[in-house]
Amino acid sequence: MASLRTEITELATGLGMLGYDNPAEAVSELPPQFIDVTDRVWEQFARVVDESLHRVDFAGAYRNGQVFLEADHGLRGRPPRLIEWKGSHRSPGHDQLPIDLRVDHVYLISCKYSSKILLNAAPSNLFAANQDVGDWYDHAAPQEHQALYAAVREEVGSNIDLPPFVGDLAKHHRTELKLALADRQWSPTCAAAYRELAAEVGRVTASQWRKSVATKRQREALLWRLLRIGPAPYYVLGSARDRSLRLLVTTPWDWRRRFEFRDLEMWGEAAGQPIVGWKATVRDHEAAEETCVDGHVEVRWSHGRFAQAPEAKVYLDTPHTQVPGYLHIDDAERWAGRISGTEIQLPLS
């Protein structure tokens, strides 16, 4: 389910495109142009946007919508007739474009506020395993995974009836173990076991990932996947640190017109948790120079230690504005105050 902050930024982005005279008018009633926004969602949105906790988020997102309305590479001053909100709906399949709003059936919008996450994926899908893997830690580092589990099981003691082997954990075991570990720091023994697990998972995962993209064309396609460059162009409206983010994400066709892929490297990092770093080198023909884009993948438990099988979270470490294939639709503006902060008061009236 989408968080309240996510709903606020996505709906405010759409509102900014509709050409209202002021924000107070914009939130006075549910616009007829909005599709798939329920009365319950709208009422909550209209009630909280003027609270101090959410004013900065609302104002920044609303401004992004206003800029998109006037941008030459956006709506060119024509308020849309239709804004479809995706909300919590999930598209079937893997790695769909990260779209939150669809405007007039044509303009695809991704609202990304203070997030460096590019993609959440099943490790077996991202790292191209030959088979579906239930628990990536068991696949990449079975001995280290079992050693960590044994240490945790011994510390938890008789409070929970747990099976001797980590591979035998059922859903109810995982739930109980998650609760038992929620307020507990790793002991020195468990911390050492976790470091060994992290190092081995990073090493094995990076090695398997490299083998799965043996050719230059495969590595180029993987880079496009990591950067969420797909068959249709879309816009990213959001924020990065203290600046607005207004970008057009191009397609592979557009990308190859300007850029030439050189290489993509992957390696396991000694970071205290399972991490695989990645770095792509690209030739920018327009600028007549080589450029790099960096990121990393965290292979970590979903929703708490041992709660679920690990997932792969792909992060972008290079600023969005410096990524090959991400084009500016305007000059970025500074944000006043911290995101979701209470220091800056931006009343709607």
Annotate each predicted stretch with a short phrase.
Residues 1-99, 103-349:
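Short, positively charged
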